[in-house]
Design a protein with these regions (language model features):
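Gly/Pro-rich active-site loop or hairpin
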Residues: 9-10, 48-52, 58, 119-181
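Active-site acidic/histidine proton-transfer and metal-coordination neighborhood
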Residues: 12-109
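Charged/polar low-complexity intrinsically disordered segments
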Residues: 231-233
């Protein structure tokens, strides 16, 4: 939603007012934003730009999340972005940084599993190990999407392009998380090369099957707190349902 929460300046007040009015009108299930920045010195960049995860950045972003939540009248969800280059200057691990933001602000976390896979491949770490450390209780929604290879670098650089089917590796990570954490509302993103409607519904059916198959594992561990029923949405060029975020 272009809030640029990791930027050096506060979220644009006029934009927040317009977003709040839109939320009142359409009553979205969730409002989300990436852990990234996209505006500087009055200029907007149509991208999700990285930053150094320092303690100073933690204070600044927590304050910006608080401002956004106050303006919107609700907690928002913060999404893990995709990473393409190793960024110098980090003082915080990404998962610890996200968890601390949630602790300070009351926000929830939006887990984009395609971003997990893309980042792990690009930076050379284990997506499974990263996912297993993610704070399950803080996840309010999951995103699935397809990715592409960089035209010049090929498999050595994956792009979170939302223009392809969800990859087998991403489905495997999704099953891994659901088996451990239980069902979560899930959104499948598709913004380019949109296929026939039947193909989109097939992916929806795959996600629903994963949620159904994964849910009993959690229920067997904690029968007094059954998991919520599966919720699947698709969002993008063939959107239906309500979502604010990306």
């Amino acid at each position: 939603v272009s809030l640029s929460l990791a930027g050096e300046s506060e979220p644009d007040a006029a934009h927040l007012r317009r977003l709040a009015a839109l939320a009142v009108r359409i009553r979205p299930a969730l409002i989300s934003e990436h852990l990234a920045w996209s505006a500087w010195n009055g200029h907007y960049f149509p991208d999700l730009l990285p930053f150094a995860r320092t303690t100073e950045a933690l204070h600044r972003i927590a304050a910006n999340i608080g401002r956004a939540q106050d303006a919107l009248g609700t907690a928002i969800a913060i999404e893990n972005p995709s990473h393409y280059l190793r960024f110098d200057g980090h003082a915080w691990d990404e998962i610890d940084f996200l968890a601390e933001l949630a602790r300070r602000t009351g926000c929830t976390l939006l887990l984009d599993i395609n971003n997990v896979h893309v980042s792990a491949r690009n930076l050379g770490y284990s997506a499974e190990a990263w996912l297993d450390r993610f704070p399950q209780a803080l996840v309010s929604e999951i995103h699935l999407a397809g990715h592409s290879q960089d035209p010049a670098l090929g498999e050595s650089l994956l792009i979170d392009s939302h223009d392809a089917p969800v990859a087998p590796e991403v489905w495997a990570l999704y099953r891994r998380f659901i088996e451990r954490a239980g069902a979560r509302p899930t959104l499948i993103e598709r913004d380019g090369n949109v296929p026939a409607f039947d193909a989109l519904m097939h992916e929806r059916s795959m996600a629903e099957a994963t949620l159904r198959e994964g849910t009993p594992t959690r229920q067997s561990r904690n029968a007094s707190h059954p998991a919520p029923p599966p919720q699947i949405r698709t969002c993008g060029a063939t959107a239906y349902g309500s979502c604010l975020g990306s």
